[in-house]
Amino acid sequence: MINRSAGFDFENIYTEMVGKYNNATFVEVGCFEGGSTVYMAELIKKSGKNIKFYAVDLFENYRPTNGQVSPSYKKFKQNTLRFAKYITVLKMDSVVASRQFADKSIDFVFLDADHTYKKVKRDIECWMPKVKDSGTLAGHDYTESSFFPGVYFPGVSRAVKGAGFDFNVDKSSWIKK
């Protein structure tokens, strides 16, 4: 069983996206050990919809911040094995992965990778053009203070606020309007 409780509070966003889109392309940037990836794959499987789902993460060479633990590709593969046919893994840097997609070709992108200001800003800049006009760009760990005990990522909040778009906040996730 995969422990999704540690910071996974965006089930409603994933559920809404699967309900909203058909014949779609989804990208999750930052997968850690696959808890949210499996959740999305389960939703896609149950929906019976034609949704291409890409999971983007370096899995290695990651410098954790705020006490985060470096993700393990081996653990990710173990956790996602039974849903492998629903997940295309892009084991690479987020910027490199974004170049694999044409502009305005993706229905839903969820950013939850490096939480430093510079990297979140870069991810928004790289992935925003890839999202269709009717699509959704969102991300995790938007907090003004410690949402979970001892967890606060000011870089995420600063990058999202500075991105120049309106957004809503749902628990600790941000969603571009």
Regions found by a protein language model. Name each.
Residues 4-177:
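S-adenosylmethionine/decaboxylated-SAM
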